[in-house]
Amino acid sequence: MKYLFYLIFPLLIFAQDPSFHEPWKLEGAGERIEKYRKTNTILNFNFPTDIKKKNGKLKIKLINHDFKFGVGFTQLRKMRGNMFDLYLERFKEAFNYATVGMYWVLTDERSSRKQIDKYYDDIIKWSIKNNVRLKGHPLMWHEGMPDWVRYSKDLDELEVAMKTHMRRLIETYPEINDWDVYNEPVGPFKPHIPYSAIQDWINYKGGIYPAMVEIYQFVNSVNPDKNYSNNHYHAKDPEYFKINEYYVQKNLNFSSIGMQAHMQSNDNVMTESQVWDQIEDYAVLGKNIQFTEITVTSSKRFNNWKDHQEFLAKRDESLRNGKEMDLPSLPEYEDFQASYLKDFYTLVFSHPSVSSITFWNLTDKNAWRGHAGGLLYKDLSPKKS
């Protein structure tokens, strides 16, 4: 019995090591990919008679994939010079879709926007040239706004400003076909959310549900042909399912349900069954499913959200004092990131209801919350992922 204990105990420790990823079973994933992501086709070529008698070589190249393999471009606007160009080159090696941050605080019509406007124009021109599809994120949110919006006292004037802002984004950037309409729609009144007048406007309209209906109806009155979607940080929140079900019942015109998955603490790392069951739960609503913001770090994860918050508070204080406080990328967690993402992408890609996966940070440079959440190091050299 003593020897059996010595055999089992190390195995238990190894299995509980948060840097170890036990490979997923992925039962049926390969077959589903063959069925839903590939197809047979017949190409007919009509040549003049004189050419038919000649031998030649035909080269066929896949220009793009229907599935959207994405990255969040929130880091790109902070890149300069050669780093900017290298970032885009690295992006093209694996991705065909990008989420462009268009938060109201960046696109504020009451401030000088020349630099950010040029950035957007340059990205759109580049995306057209390189067959990259874009998503604008978001048209409206209860965070990331200028102070004149946050502390607005006249709710009728605020409503005009909100609708003017959403119209301006849709009409100014017609090349962008995908838009997150209202980011995190069941989140405005969560305890951790800071005050904004948009919360007052939501109450003024009768609550979250009627306010969201009005927003969706408005953006569709501006342009009904866009791919409108929503997005939330916890798709497992039953309120998020309920509001999407309500949208469907109201016959609102939207194409996709967005799910975030920022796995920066051990309790947020999704298992194979959790990922699959979450997709299946939402698939019954008949909409495309987008994994909109994925983070799998190669830095040491926190045990839980409380530990994570303590770090974020210290990091915020450090940044206020002009000092960076980023978590280092560690070899054992780089192994985890690579093996976990291989399984995650395989499983999600195999489900016919999923239309996109967007990895939030391409690089550790300026990565969200200071985690080593990129697929590239800060110098833009690749990790194992």
Predicted regions and their residues:
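Aromatic-rich peripheral "rim/lid" segments of glycoside hydrolase catalytic domains that contact
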Residues: E34, D180, P185-F218, Q274-G286, ...
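Noncatalytic carbohydrate-binding groove/subsite architecture in carbohydrate-active enzymes
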Residues: T74-D85, E89, A197-R320
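Short, acidic/polar
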Residues: L76-K92, E157-L169, D237-Y247, A338-L347
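An acidic-aromatic substrate-binding cleft motif
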Residues: Y36-K38, I42, K59-L106, I124, ...
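Sec-dependent N-terminal signal peptides
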Residues: Y3-I13
